[in-house]
């Protein structure tokens, strides 16, 4: 039997990806509902006190949002790198349709939000909140439909969401970075340079990469750049090829694939559920009918529910009409519409951007109302449309 190729990866990575993402979506959904229930129960004071309690230099909530989510962004970065180099986004032809759809699905929600908040300057900083898609939630809902949805549509949704994640990372880096400490930022650049050099030399020891990644995280945290970006930067430096010759069987799989395989379960079943439980809790005790006219909450909900659909479905329709792309194999227009609605589930990344955009707890709560309402409606409508479309296809 011939030895492993230099780009060998674990068996069925796409199947493993869908398995983890769909299961993670269901677990995340349960934790989000649990957080809402606790926040509206007699346990609420203890819940919020625990989140705001300090453990060392950061509060518990900050450790979750800045620390654990850096690991989530590391996994996101690994998935983006893998898909661009060897996967569903490896050629421009494969990138075109989900790429254009992702751009439309980020731009139009932002425009919808801004239009509704033109007279509310304080709220404009949240323009990017409805631009995000939660791939775990979206694939989790899609998994409930089983064989009613063609696999090509699942791949399209995954590719679209991965590009969407890349866009969200860029937005966070550019628009949601605080005052910069130049000295520590230069230190972070130096560490990143070391990581790039190790990658260029195809250095295989993940322990060294992770140790330097931890140093990079600390430097970015102190510098004012959001520390979670350390995860993405580290991912860019993890080699995707194996050493030309290694007697160690554990090293016959590329470091990127080893690390991605190692992180999938902890991120899916620990980090994302913890994030959801720590951030989805919002009290409805003070909610009034006035929330229906609150442009911040309505802007987020409308961006997710209307902006995503118009942006994604419109972009796909334009590309197909201009004969620049074709619909995913065996997919119908009604199914594409259903996927566009599912992309309006913006939970994890939308919450994350909302917390970066606003420090005022009251504004954060209004953002959460909008995210919950928009994501719930988008998920229900997307599921319903795909279920109807699946019956027609049978």
From Swiss-Prot:
It is found in: Cell inner membrane. It comes from Azorhizobium caulinodans (strain ATCC 43989 / DSM 5975 / JCM 20966 / LMG 6465 / NBRC 14845 / NCIMB 13405 / ORS 571). Na(+)/H(+) antiporter that extrudes sodium in exchange for external protons. The keyword Cell membrane applies. Keywords: Antiport, Cell inner membrane, Cell membrane, Ion transport, Membrane, Sodium, Sodium transport, Transmembrane, Transmembrane helix, Transport. The keyword Transmembrane applies. GO terms for cellular component: plasma membrane. This is Na(+)/H(+) antiporter NhaA.
């Amino acid at each position: 039997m011939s030895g492993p190729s230099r780009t060998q990866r674990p068996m069925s990575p796409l199947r493993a990806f869908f398995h983890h993402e769909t299961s993670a979506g269901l677990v995340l959904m349960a934790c989000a509902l649990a957080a809402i229930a606790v926040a509206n129960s007699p346990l609420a004071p203890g819940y919020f006190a625990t989140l705001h309690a300090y453990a060392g230099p950061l509060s518990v909530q900050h450790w979750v949002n800045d620390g654990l989510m850096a690991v989530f962004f590391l996994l996101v970065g690994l998935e983006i790198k893998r898909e661009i180099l060897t996967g569903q986004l490896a050629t421009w032809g494969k990138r075109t349709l989900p790429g254009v759809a992702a751009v439309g699905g980020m731009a139009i929600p932002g425009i919808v939000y801004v239009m509704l908040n033109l007279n509310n300057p304080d709220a404009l900083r949240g323009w990017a909140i409805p631009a995000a898609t939660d791939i775990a939630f979206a694939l989790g809902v899609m998994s409930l439909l089983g064989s009613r949805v063609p696999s090509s549509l699942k791949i399209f949704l995954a590719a679209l969401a991965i590009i969407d994640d890349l866009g969200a990372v860029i937005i966070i880096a550019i628009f949601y970075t605080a005052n910069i400490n130049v000295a520590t930022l230069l230190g972070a650049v130096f560490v990143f340079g070391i990581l790039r050099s190790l990658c260029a030399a195809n250095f295989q020891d993940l322990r060294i990469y992770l140790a330097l990644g931890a140093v990079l995280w600390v430097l970015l945290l102190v510098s004012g750049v959001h520390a979670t970006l350390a995860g993405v930067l580290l991912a860019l430096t993890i080699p995707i090829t194996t050493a030309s010759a290694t007697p160690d069987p554990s090293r016959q799989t590329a470091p990127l694939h080893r690390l991605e395989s190692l992180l999938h379960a902890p991120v899916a079943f620990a980090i994302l559920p913890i994030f959801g439980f720590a951030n989805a809790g919002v009290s409805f005790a003070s909610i009034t009918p006035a929330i229906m006219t609150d442009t911040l909450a309505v802007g987020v909900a409308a961006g997710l529910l209307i902006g995503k659909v118009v942006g994604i479905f419109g972009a796909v329709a334009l590309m197909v009409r201009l004969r620049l792309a074709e619909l995913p194999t065996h997919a119908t227009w009604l199914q594409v519409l259903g996927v566009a609605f599912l992309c309006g589930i913006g939970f994890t990344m939308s919450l994350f951007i909302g917390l970066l955009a606003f420090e005022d707890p009251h504004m954060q709560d209004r953002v959460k109302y909008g995210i919950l309402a928009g994501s719930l409606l988008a998920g229900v409508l997307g599921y319903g449309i795909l279920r109807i479309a699946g019956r027609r296809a049978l």
